[in-house]
C-alpha cells in the first residue's frame, strides 16, 4: 500500500517538474541565448526481495540543457567571421564613398596636363591668361589630392577610436564572464545553474563578435577563454584585460596590448577588432601610400620638366608643386641620439611600401614592413640609398635602434602649389642649337635634352665642332675644351647638364652652336613636353604614369570592396547554417513543447489517479479492520 502511494507521489512530482520545465521552455522560446531544458528521469531502485521485485517509482535526476558544445563553438566561430566581414565591408564601403565624394582626381589630372597644351597653343606668347588657367588647374589637382588625403587621415583617426572603444567593450565582457564563472562554480553544489550557463554562453558569443575566441570547459564548471591566437583572456574568476597604446613608431596610431603590456596587434584575428586592424594595415595604409606615390610622381616629374625650360622672364622654371619630406619616425625604444632625414631621389624606383631601418651596432639594414630586405648602398657622404630614397643619418645610434620610413604616407595631404606667378610657367625649351652656315655634311641635331637643370653652366654657350668626320670637340665661349674624342654616327654628346644627338653624318669642319634659347617667347617645346607627361611612365620603374597609378589605386580599392561584399554574403550564409544546426539541438520547438505539455499533463493526472487509488484501498482496509 505504502509502495503504491510512494510510487504515485514520485510520478506526480516528476510530472510536475516536467510540466514546469516545459512551461519554462515555452515562455523562453523567443529569448536569445536560451537553451531548451530537458528533464532527466531515472527509475528508483527497489529494495531487495526474497521472491520478486516491484518497481519503486521515479526520481528526477537533473534538469539539463539540450546542448552541444561542438555546435555552440561553431556558432561562436561563425559569429566572429560574420562580425569581421560586416565591419570590413562597412569600412571598405566608406572608403569607396570617400573617393567618390571627394572629387574626380583623374579628371583634374587630365585638365591639368591638357592646360599645358593650351599654353603651347596660345596665339600670343606674352598672353598669360592660359598660364593663369594652368595654375588654376594645378591648384585644383592639389586640392583634390589634399582632400583625399584628409579623408584617409580622418578614417585612420576613426579607426583609432573604434579600436579603443572595442577594447573597452571586450574588457567589460571579460569581467562579466569571469564573474559568471565564479557564480557558476559556487552554484554547482545545489544543481546545474542552467540560466547562468546560458548567460555565460551568450557573453562568449558577444565576445566572439569582437575577436576570435575559444572557450574550454574546466572540471570545476568554469570556462577558460582564449583568443584565436592562444592569448589567455579568462581563467576562472580572473579576467586578463586588454589595453590600447601608441604604436612604437607612430604615436598617433593605436595598437592593442595584452594584460602584461605586450603588443599583440598583429596576433588579433576575427571579429570587429580583427577587421579594424586588418583593414587598416592591408587597405587603408596601402591606399594612403598609393595616393601619396601618385602625388610624388606628379610633383617630381612636373617640377623636373618645368626646371628644364625657360619662363617668360628667360629664367629656368621654378617648381610648380611642393611636397612634404618623407617621414622617418624613430622607435620609442631607441637608446641613441640618431635622427634620419629621408629624401626621394629616384621617383621611378619609389614603391608604395613603408620600411623599417635598423642599426645592429655596426651597420644599417632596411626591410619592408612585411619583412622583405631592401638593398642599401652607402654614399661617399655617408648617407644611405635604396628604394628610390636617400637617408641621411645624423647623431649616434645604438645597437637595436630603428626607424619607420614612410616615403609616401603624407605626400597627398601635404601637396601644395608653390608657383603663383603665371609668367613663371617654363613653356620654352631652355636650349637651342644652330648649325654653322658653312657646314657641308648631313649632320643635324635630332635631340637636345636637359639632363641636369641644376648645372650652373647649363645656359652657357658651347660649340660642338668636328675637326674630322670621326672626331669631335666641345668648347665653351671662353675657349675651354669641355670634351673631345672619337665620334661615331648616332653617338650622344654631353656637357654642362645637357645631351645632344645628331642624325646624319657631320663632315670635317662642321660645327653646331648650343646656347640658351633666345626665342623663348615664341617657343612651346617645354610646354609640349609637360603635356606629354600625362602618358609618360614616371613610376614603377617608368612603367606607370601618374594617372595609371591613381587608376591602380581605385581598382585596388574597388576590388577590396567587392571582395568584402562577397565575403559578407558568404559569412552571413555560413553563420545562418551554424545557427540552424545549433538551434536544432538547443532551440525551443513550440509544437514539440505543446505535445510534451499534453504528455506530462496526462502523466500528472495518471499519477494523481495512482495516489487516489492507494488512498481508496487504504480507506477500504481501515474500514474492514474496524468492523
Ranges and model annotations:
Residues 1-627:
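S/T-rich, low-complexity, solvent-exposed segments of bacterial secretion/appendage proteins
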Amino acid at each position: 500500500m505504502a509502495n503504491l502511494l510512494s510510487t504515485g507521489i514520485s510520478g506526480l512530482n516528476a510530472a510536475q517538474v516536467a510540466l514546469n520545465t516545459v512551461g519554462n521552455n515555452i515562455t523562453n522560446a523567443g529569448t536569445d541565448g536560451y537553451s531548451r531544458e530537458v528533464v532527466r528521469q531515472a527509475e528508483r531502485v527497489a529494495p531487495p526481495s526474497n521472491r520478486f521485485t516491484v518497481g519503486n517509482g521515479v526520481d528526477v535526476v537533473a534538469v539539463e540543457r539540450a546542448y552541444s558544445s561542438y555546435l555552440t563553438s561553431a556558432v561562436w566561430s561563425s559569429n566572429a567571421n560574420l562580425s569581421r566581414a560586416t565591419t570590413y565591408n562597412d569600412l571598405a564601403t566608406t572608403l569607396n564613398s570617400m573617393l567618390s565624394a571627394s572629387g574626380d582626381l583623374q579628371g583634374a589630372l587630365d585638365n591639368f596636363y591638357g592646360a599645358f597644351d593650351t599654353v603651347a597653343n596660345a596665339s600670343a606668347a606674352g598672353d598669360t591668361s592660359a598660364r593663369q588657367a594652368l595654375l588654376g588647374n594645378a591648384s585644383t589637382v592639389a586640392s583634390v589630392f589634399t582632400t583625399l588625403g584628409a579623408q584617409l587621415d580622418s578614417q585612420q583617426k576613426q579607426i583609432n577610436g573604434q579600436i579603443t572603444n572595442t577594447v573597452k567593450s571586450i574588457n567589460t565582457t571579460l569581467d562579466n564572464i569571469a564573474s559568471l564563472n565564479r557564480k557558476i562554480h559556487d552554484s554547482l553544489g545545489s544543481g546545474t545553474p542552467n540560466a547562468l550557463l546560458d548567460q555565460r554562453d551568450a557573453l562568449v558569443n558577444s565576445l566572439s563578435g569582437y575577436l576570435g575566441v575559444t572557450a574550454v570547459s574546466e572540471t570545476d564548471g568554469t570556462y577558460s577563454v582564449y583568443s584565436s591566437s592562444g592569448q589567455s583572456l579568462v581563467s576562472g574568476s580572473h579576467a586578463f584585460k586588454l589595453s590600447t597604446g601608441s604604436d612604437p613608431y607612430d604615436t598617433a596610431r593605436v595598437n592593442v596590448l595584452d594584460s602584461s603590456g605586450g603588443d599583440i596587434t598583429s596576433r588579433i584575428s576575427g571579429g570587429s577588432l580583427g577587421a579594424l586592424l586588418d583593414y587598416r594595415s592591408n587597405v587603408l595604409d596601402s591606399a594612403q601610400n598609393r595616393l601619396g606615390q601618385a602625388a610624388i610622381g606628379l610633383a617630381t616629374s612636373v617640377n623636373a620638366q618645368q626646371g628644364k625650360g625657360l619662363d617668360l622672364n628667360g629664367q629656368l622654371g621654378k617648381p610648380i608643386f611642393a611636397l612634404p619630406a618623407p617621414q622617418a619616425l624613430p622607435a620609442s625604444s631607441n637608446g641613441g641620439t640618431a635622427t634620419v632625414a629621408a629624401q626621394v631621389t629616384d621617383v621611378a624606383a619609389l614603391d608604395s611600401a613603408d620600411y623599417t631601418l635598423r642599426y645592429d651596432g655596426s651597420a644599417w639594414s632596411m626591410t619592408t614592413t612585411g619583412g622583405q630586405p631592401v638593398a642599401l648602398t652607402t654614399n661617399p657622404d655617408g648617407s644611405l640609398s635604396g628604394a628610390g630614397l636617400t637617408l641621411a643619418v645624423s647623431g649616434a645610434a645604438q645597437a637595436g635602434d630603428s626607424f619607420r620610413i614612410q616615403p609616401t604616407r603624407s605626400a597627398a595631404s601635404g601637396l601644395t602649389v608653390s608657383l603663383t606667378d603665371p609668367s613663371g610657367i617654363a613653356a620654352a625649351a631652355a636650349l637651342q642649337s644652330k648649325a654653322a652656315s658653312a657646314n657641308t655634311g648631313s649632320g643635324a641635331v635630332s635631340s637636345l635634352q636637359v639632363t641636369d637643370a641644376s648645372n650652373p653652366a647649363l645656359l652657357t654657350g658651347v660649340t660642338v665642332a668636328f675637326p674630322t668626320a670621326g672626331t669631335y670637340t666641345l668648347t665653351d665661349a671662353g675657349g675651354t675644351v669641355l670634351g673631345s674624342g672619337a665620334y661615331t654616327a648616332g653617338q650622344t654628346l654631353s656637357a654642362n647638364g645637357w645631351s645632344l644627338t645628331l642624325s646624319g653624318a657631320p663632315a670635317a669642319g662642321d660645327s653646331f652652336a648650343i646656347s640658351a634659347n633666345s626665342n623663348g617667347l615664341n617657343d612651346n617645346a617645354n610646354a609640349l613636353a609637360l603635356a606629354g607627361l600625362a602618358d609618360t611612365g614616371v613610376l614603377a620603374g617608368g612603367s606607370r604614369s601618374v594617372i595609371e597609378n591613381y587608376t591602380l589605386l581605385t581598382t585596388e580599392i574597388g576590388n577590396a570592396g567587392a571582395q568584402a561584399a562577397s565575403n559578407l554574403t558568404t559569412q552571413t550564409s555560413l553563420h545562418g547554417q551554424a545557427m540552424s544546426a545549433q538551434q536544432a539541438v538547443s532551440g525551443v520547438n513550440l509544437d514539440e513543447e505543446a505535445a510534451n505539455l499534453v504528455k506530462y499533463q496526462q502523466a500528472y493526472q495518471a499519477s494523481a489517479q495512482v495516489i487516489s487509488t492507494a488512498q481508496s484501498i487504504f480507506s477500504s482496509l481501515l474500514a474492514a479492520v474496524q468492523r
